[in-house]
């Protein structure tokens, strides 16, 4: 069965978004949605969810390097609950440790001339999704 997925790299200022498919286990950055103190632009996120129509939404859970919760972990969990209620999709939380570092490394590897926050956040969502797909 074809399974479309969306991954979200939650942040207080921006939310990175990636799409993927379980059949190919590939992820593609979509872009970012602006957030204001952790509250996303729901209209933009609604459009993305409607367009991609994912069966599942994977959200990166910000934990520290020893898997302890951080200041933003509770906000990410609250966001995940709201996403589940709003879109009525399965929501999975996955440790996003090092996803931003991995995204920056990938951009440097391809010698991206402009390592913007938008690229990093969307690519971090790809890393989150690829990690989840490899584990499921």
From Swiss-Prot:
- HAMAP family linked to this entry: Nuclease_YqgF
Where is this protein found?
A: Cytoplasm
Q: Which GO terms describe its molecular function?
A: nuclease activity
Q: Could you list this entry's UniProt keywords, alphabetically sorted.
A: Cytoplasm, Hydrolase, Nuclease, Ribosome biogenesis
Q: State one Pfam family annotation.
A: RuvX
Q: Which PANTHER family is this protein grouped with?
A: POLYNUCLEOTIDYL TRANSFERASE, RIBONUCLEASE H-LIKE SUPERFAMILY PROTEIN (PTHR33317:SF4)
InterPro entries the record matches = RNaseH-like_sf, YqgF, YqgF/RNaseH-like_dom, YqgF/RNaseH-like_dom_sf
Q: What is this protein called?
A: Putative pre-16S rRNA nuclease
What is one GO biological process annotated to this record? rRNA 5'-end processing
Q: What is its EC number?
A: 3.1.-.-
Q: Which Gene3D superfamilies match?
A: YqgF/RNase H-like domain
Its job: Could be a nuclease involved in processing of the 5'-end of pre-16S rRNA.
Q: What is the similarity comment for this entry?
A: Belongs to the YqgF nuclease family.
Which branch of life, at top level? Bacteria
Q: Gene Ontology cellular component?
A: cytosol
Q: Which organism is the protein's source? A: Francisella tularensis subsp. holarctica (strain LVS)
> Its principal location?
cytoplasm
